Amino acid sequence: MTSSFALVLLLGGVAVCVATGVFGGYSERANHQANPEFLNLAHYATSTWSAQQPGKTHFDTVAEVLKVETQVVAGTNYRLTLKVAESTCELTSTYNKDTCLPKADAAHRTCTTVVFESLQGDKSVSSFECEAA
């Protein structure tokens, strides 16, 4: 009887975690625009990705962070939805979020990126996809 009760409690707890998105899924972060960590991750992902694109001459930069979701794994996955645009900074320069501003005539694109941050603090861009302008 005790083991049946424990099993029911365990299964109920798993069901609650799955239903609320706590168990392995992404959770949306409220007040993401007030958190400078998310903006820094967005700039890291955008500048890293744009520097690796063949034929590009300028970095892309973040115009706006639209949405942030996190997933706890062996570290944290940050799924960021962004508005990005080509910046005034050439790829031959060093990217700086304060000086690499969007070009006045640049088209803004909506992009989704996933940045993985390990438990040791190392970051990498897992994916970066944009809708057509």
Swiss-Prot record:
CDD domains: CY. It comes from Ixodes scapularis (Black-legged tick). SUPFAM superfamilies: Cystatin/monellin. Residues 30-117 form the Cystatin domain. This is Salivary cystatin-L. Monomer. Can form homodimers in vitro, but probably not in vivo. Homodimers are predicted to be inactive; dimerization disrupts the interaction with target proteases. Gene3D superfamilies: 3.10.450.10. Disulfide bonds join C89-C100, C111-C130. Residues 1-19 form the signal peptide. Pfam families: Cystatin (PF00031). One of its GO terms (cellular component) is extracellular space. Keywords: Disulfide bond, Protease inhibitor, Secreted, Signal, Thiol protease inhibitor. PROSITE patterns: CYSTATIN (PS00287). GO terms for molecular function: cysteine-type endopeptidase inhibitor activity. Belongs to the cystatin family. The record marks G24 as: Reactive site. It is found in: Secreted. Inhibitor of cysteine proteinases. Inhibits host immune responses via its inhibition of host cathepsins. Contributes to the suppression of the host's immune response to tick salivary proteins and is important for successful feeding on hosts. Inhibits differentiation of host dendritic cells. Inhibits proliferation of host T-cells in response to antigen stimulus. Down-regulates TLR2-mediated host responses to infection by B.burgdorferi and the production of the chemokine CCL3 by host dendritic cells.
